[in-house]
């Protein structure tokens, strides 16, 4: 076997060495890749790991020390990790996505490289479902446009003026809501929608029979049936190579004339060019999007900039202070389980277990022999003078922690394969769940 197929000291591809702990070894380094606040994570990890933040938007902005030595990574949705990116991390054993969606991580390549990928699937179910219902109600009752009219100084007093400014407002009772993907959020939306008087249909080819009876919903067997019967369509499935641009010009033409569309799942599910054209032509009466193909979203550019009857929010449907704290705590606990236990057996929400080619033990930590260490240092790229801030406070200058363990691995240069869109197929099942996971 050539050197290009080795990671370290003769270990085959996919096997990474155990993490050495104890008084003779530095503590493992854990990095928050795309954020700078570690105050929630540090109390959970401070006795077993050194915690640092990178505040990066790409791997080019991550300091070499993190790339060489970090064994654990925490991340949100603002950074993408392809195989090429993953190969830059020489000692990484686990990535935890702070949220449920993980389409910004190449989980198969991570598994090939011996890196476990985990998520936090349940923390923001209520928030996302509530936000979805807010968007649906807004489309039906035209609240945003009525508010905007008053802000612009429009005089609204007579019945004729009200009729003009509220044109398009509709009654909800008896309308049919079509849900694509009946995972945690999809079910929560269904229960809320029934309370408002919606007839609820859903399409989910990977969900076991019987859930529709338990929840009092109507199940359809094809996406075309759902689009044909729905007055409003809402998306709650994950994004994968099979359902990219699930909503496109072809599927939009299968929707009812004048239907509404809501997406709080993943931006790549909707072809925004096709949606913009459908809104301009009136084939879709209105749309509400919390997620977009290109984020951060701006009305000043892109195909949706001139689209009428459109509500957009900045990928915030998942957010509440309570949910944010809960998911960060659970993400830190998952990192702790990885450090103190065995990968992947000790992990609660590993999404690429089937792709991991091998699992190695992490040495158990003995708190009695671990000395207090500075945490919360900044690890962002510009090279230069280094410093670390104690007690989780941001460092005065960005830098590194000295005296950390150095591991060197050689990775094969493999290009990340592009995902080919296949609009006719929707959700792809994942090994760690019984129903489609919902995406944040």
UniProtKB/Swiss-Prot annotation:
Subcellular locations according to the entry: Nucleus
Family indicated by similarity: Belongs to the D-isomer specific 2-hydroxyacid dehydrogenase family.
PROSITE patterns: D_2_HYDROXYACID_DH_1, D_2_HYDROXYACID_DH_3
Molecular function in Gene Ontology: DNA-binding transcription factor binding; NAD binding; oxidoreductase activity, acting on the CH-OH group of donors, NAD or NADP as acceptor; transcription coactivator activity; transcription coregulator binding; transcription corepressor activity
Function, as annotated: Corepressor targeting diverse transcription regulators. Has dehydrogenase activity.
Lineage: superkingdom: Eukaryota
Active-site residues, as the UniProt record annotates them: 266, 295, 315
Name of the protein: C-terminal-binding protein 1
Enzyme Commission numbers on file: 1.1.1.-
Organism: Xenopus laevis (African clawed frog)
Gene name, Swiss-Prot/TrEMBL: ctbp1
Region (Disordered): 409-440
């Amino acid at each position: 076997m050539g050197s290009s197929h080795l990671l370290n000291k003769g270990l085959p591809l996919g096997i990474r060495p155990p993490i050495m702990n104890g008084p003779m070894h530095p503590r493992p380094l854990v990095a928050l890749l795309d954020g700078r606040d570690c105050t929630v994570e540090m109390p959970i990890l401070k006795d077993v790991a050194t915690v640092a933040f990178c505040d990066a938007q790409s791997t080019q902005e991550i300091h070499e020390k993190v790339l060489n030595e970090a064994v654990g990574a925490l991340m949100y949705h603002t950074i993408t990790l392809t195989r090429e990116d993953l190969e830059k991390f020489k000692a990484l054993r686990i990535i935890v996505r702070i949220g449920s969606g993980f389409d910004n991580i190449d989980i198969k390549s991570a598994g090939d490289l011996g890196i476990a990928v985990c998520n936090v699937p349940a923390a923001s179910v209520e928030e996302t479902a509530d936000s979805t219902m807010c968007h649906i109600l807004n489309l039906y009752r035209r609240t945003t446009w009525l508010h905007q009219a008053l802000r612009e100084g429009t005089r609204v007093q007579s019945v004729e003026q009200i009729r003009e400014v509220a044109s398009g407002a509709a009654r909800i009772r008896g309308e049919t809501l079509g849900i694509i993907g009946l995972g945690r959020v999809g079910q929560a939306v269904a229960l809320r929608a029934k309370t408002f008087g919606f007839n609820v249909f859903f399409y989910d080819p990977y969900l076991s029979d019987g859930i529709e009876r338990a929840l009092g919903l109507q199940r359809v067997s094809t996406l075309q049936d759902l689009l044909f019967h729905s007055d409003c369509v809402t998306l709650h499935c994950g994004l994968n190579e099979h359902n990219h641009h699930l909503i496109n010009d072809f599927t939009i033409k299968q929707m009812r004339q004048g239907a509404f569309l809501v997406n709080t799942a993943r931006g790549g599910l909707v072809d925004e060019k096709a949606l913009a054209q459908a809104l301009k032509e009136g084939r879709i009466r209105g749309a509400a999007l919390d997620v977009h193909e290109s984020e951060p979203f701006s009305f000043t550019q892109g195909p949706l900039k001139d689209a009428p009857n459109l509500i957009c929010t900045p990928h915030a449907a998942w957010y509440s202070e309570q949910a944010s704290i809960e998911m960060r705590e659970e993400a830190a606990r998952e990192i702790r389980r990885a450090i103190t236990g065995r990968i992947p057996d000790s992990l609660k929400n590993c999404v690429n277990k089937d792709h991991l080619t091998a699992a190695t033990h992490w040495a158990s930590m003995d708190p009695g022999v671990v000395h207090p260490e500075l945490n919360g240092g900044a690890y962002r790229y510009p090279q230069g003078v280094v410093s670390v801030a104690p007690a989780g406070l941001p460092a005065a200058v960005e830098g590194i922690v000295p005296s950390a363990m150095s591991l060197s691995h050689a990775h094969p240069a493999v290009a990340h394969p592009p995902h080919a869109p296949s609009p006719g197929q929707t959700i792809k099942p994942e090994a760690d769940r019984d129903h489609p996971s919902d995406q944040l």
